[in-house]
């Protein structure tokens, strides 16, 4: 019995789903949510639009799934790099990880900007995400203040919001102009938050 080409080309559901998410990440990152259609994504994957809808019921659902996959990778990496590392070292490791994944970074930057509009499908997603990330970074700041690694006068919540703003802004600058050494600039900024002592034990500001 000879298999048809459609049977031979059929991929396991998990493999096909990942393929769709990879294509969607690039498409949404390059063109934004409204600049790309499900038909475009399906054609790039090599399946029909009904075939794509078998995995994701709508373009909105596909966008959120792509963002969730990106965050799953990001938060998993954060858990690894922050294990036993200082806030500064952990954030710099995360910066380098992001730089190694430009398609993922572009998806984040473009969609975050679009989601300012309340009607955007990712508006609620990004509001919740920023709350989660600010809380996580603030917790690391408090830990390092207790350990004497960061300046005690820093407000952890305000500093967490500031760090995220700096990192997000540097990512946009790097996407626009790769000659910007975003991780070097990030390190210079973060080192200003650290507690340093002179040879005679005085704290250096």
Please identify what each model-predicted range represents.
Residues 1-15, 200-205:
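N-terminal intrinsically disordered/low-complexity leader segments
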Residues 2, 16-19, 23-65:
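Helix-turn-helix
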Residues 23-30, 77, 107, 114, ...:
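Solvent-exposed, amphipathic alpha-helical segments
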Residues 60, 71, 164-168:
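Conserved acidic functional residues
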Residues 65, 76-105, 156-163:
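Hydrophobic alpha-helical connector segments
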Residues 68-74:
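Short, basic, alpha-helical segments at the C-terminal edge of helix-turn-helix-like DNA-binding modules
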Residues 100-124:
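Amphipathic alpha-helical segments used for helix-helix packing
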Residues 119-131, 146-193, 200-205:
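Hydrophobic/aromatic-rich alpha-helical bundle segments in the mid-to-C-terminal region
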């Amino acid at each position: 019995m000879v298999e048809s080409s459609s049977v031979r080309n059929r991929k396991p559901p998990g493999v096909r789903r990942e393929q769709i998410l990879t294509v969607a990440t690039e498409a949404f990152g390059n063109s934004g949510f409204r600049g790309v259609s499900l038909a475009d994504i399906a054609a790039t994957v090599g399946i029909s639009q009904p075939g794509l809808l078998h995995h994701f019921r709508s373009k909105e659902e596909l966008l959120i799934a792509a963002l969730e996959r990106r965050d799953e990778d990001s938060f998993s990496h954060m858990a690894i790099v922050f294990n036993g590392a200082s806030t500064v070292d952990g954030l710099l490791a995360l910066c380098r990880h992001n730089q190694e994944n430009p398609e993922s970074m572009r998806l984040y930057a473009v969609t975050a900007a679009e989601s300012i509009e309340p009607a955007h499908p990712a508006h609620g997603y990004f509001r919740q995400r920023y709350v989660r990330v600010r809380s996580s970074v603030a917790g690391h700041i408090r830990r390092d203040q207790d350990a004497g690694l960061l300046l005690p006068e820093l407000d952890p919540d305000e500093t967490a919001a500031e760090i995220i703003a700096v990192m997000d802004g540097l990512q946009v600058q790097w996407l626009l102009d790769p000659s910007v050494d975003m991780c070097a600039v990030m390190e210079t900024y973060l080192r200003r938050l650290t507690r340093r002592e002179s040879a005679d034990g005085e704290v250096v500001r």
